[in-house]
């Protein structure tokens, strides 16, 4: 039985403001689910509904098989880590860690045991007598996580806990979180707009947009088999190339070449083709199957160049394809020939935006 389950969850503020729409998903023990999406997609509202900080308009929330939809937060045995850490500035690290346990009136020996165990796991033993103002951002974040751990909850909820950290510290704390939650036996629900956090931390990802779950899957499936145009464009950096192409006789026309479309796909007059910049290959100029274009922009990313290539299409005008090229690769910086491996091409319905692959696989 799933430890956390959302069934047809909705939240309506006004007829025009509906941040959560028909969300149904489950998170088992030891699973790490990330709610990923842009600002305003409904991910934080969904987390607040799970926490009991807001009440759903309709739908059901269950934890451990028990319906908690209308239970107050204190009766759900959840622990939440906030973006702002939510530490008491006048308390020491020790006092912050044990404050929730004292409110639950646990015996002092048990409180001290739990706090000592968590302090050892998080490396906080030498900080126990300091106050938050005397700590770095990374240390404060570890204490916020520690406050959640000492509760021994049925579900962990984390609301963008790394967004206040600088890039280097965020990378280090992200690795710490991955190791830490791999040892926990309860579900984790994590909210972020950062796809790197979602891809590296999660066992599964729910991509949200406009209140709906666009795709719920393992991170590698989200990346390699996007269900629709939104997921394809939102997940991946640099962004996937998405080109609207004319079609005829089971081929799409791009520049001087025609690209075969799988025979099992229905083919209207136009389709949207997608391919990620890292999957495009440089071809020899004499290769007849290659697409030829002119380099319009080169961006140095360190290990790679991100190269924008103009492709002339006699029917639809000039199109831009972006390709990642290793920085140690020699290539013509003016004219370039490209190959699009068919196994890395995605096809999307121009009207619905849905992946054609998802219809047939």
What are these regions (language model features)?
Residues 1-6, 10-22, 29, 71-75:
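A short, flexible loop at the N-terminus of ABC-type nucleotide-binding domains that lies
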Residues 36-38:
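The feature captures the beta-strand-to-loop junction immediately N-terminal to the Walker
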Residues 44-47, 143:
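ABC ATPase nucleotide-binding domain helices that frame the ATP-binding cleft
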Residues 51:
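Helix-to-loop junction immediately C-terminal to a conserved catalytic motif
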Residues 59-67:
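Conserved ABC transporter NBD signature motif
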Residues 71-230:
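ABC ATPase nucleotide-binding domains
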Residues 238, 251-361:
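Non-catalytic connector elements of ABC transporters
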């Amino acid at each position: 039985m799933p430890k956390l389950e959302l069934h047809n969850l909705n939240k309506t503020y006004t007829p025009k403001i509906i941040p959560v729409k028909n969300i149904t998903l489950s998170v088992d023990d030891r699973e790490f689910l990330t709610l990923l999406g842009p600002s305003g997609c409904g991910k934080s509202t969904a987390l607040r509904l799970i926490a009991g900080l807001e009440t759903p308009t309709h739908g059901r929330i269950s934890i451990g098989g028990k319906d908690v939809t209308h239970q107050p937060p204190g009766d759900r045995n959840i622990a939440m880590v906030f973006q702002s850490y939510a530490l008491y500035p006048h308390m020491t690290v020790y006092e912050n860690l044990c404050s929730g346990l004292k409110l639950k009136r646990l015996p002092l020996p048990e409180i001290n045991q739990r706090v000592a165990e968590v302090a050892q796991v998080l490396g906080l033993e030498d900080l126990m007598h300091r106050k938050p103002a005397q700590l770095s951002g990374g240390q404060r974040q570890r204490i916020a996580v520690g406050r959640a751990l000492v509760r021994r909850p049925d579900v962990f909820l984390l609301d963008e806990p790394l967004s206040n950290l600088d890039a280097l510290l965020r990378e280090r704390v992200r690795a710490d979180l991955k190791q830490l939650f791999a040892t926990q036996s309860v579900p984790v629900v994590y909210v972020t707009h950062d796809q790197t956090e979602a891809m590296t931390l999660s066992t599964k990802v729910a991509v949200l947009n406009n209140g709906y779950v666009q795709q719920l899957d393992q991170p590698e499936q989200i990346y390699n088999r996007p269900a629709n145009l939104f997921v394809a464009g939102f997940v991946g950096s640099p962004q996937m190339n998405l080109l609207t192409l004319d079609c005829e006789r089971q081929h799409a026309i791009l520049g001087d070449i025609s690209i075969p479309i799988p025979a099992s796909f229905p083919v209207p007059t136009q389709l949207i083709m997608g391919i990620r910049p890292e999957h495009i290959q440089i071809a020899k100029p004499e290769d007849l199957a290659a697409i030829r274009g002119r380099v319009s922009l080169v961006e140095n990313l360190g290990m790679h160049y991100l190269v924008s290539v103009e492709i002339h299409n006699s029917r639809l005008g000039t199109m831009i394809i972006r390709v990642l090229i290793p920085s140690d690769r020699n290539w013509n910086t003016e004219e370039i020939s490209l190959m699009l491996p068919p196994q890395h091409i995605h096809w999307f319905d121009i009207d619905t935006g849905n992946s054609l692959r998802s219809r047939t696989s």
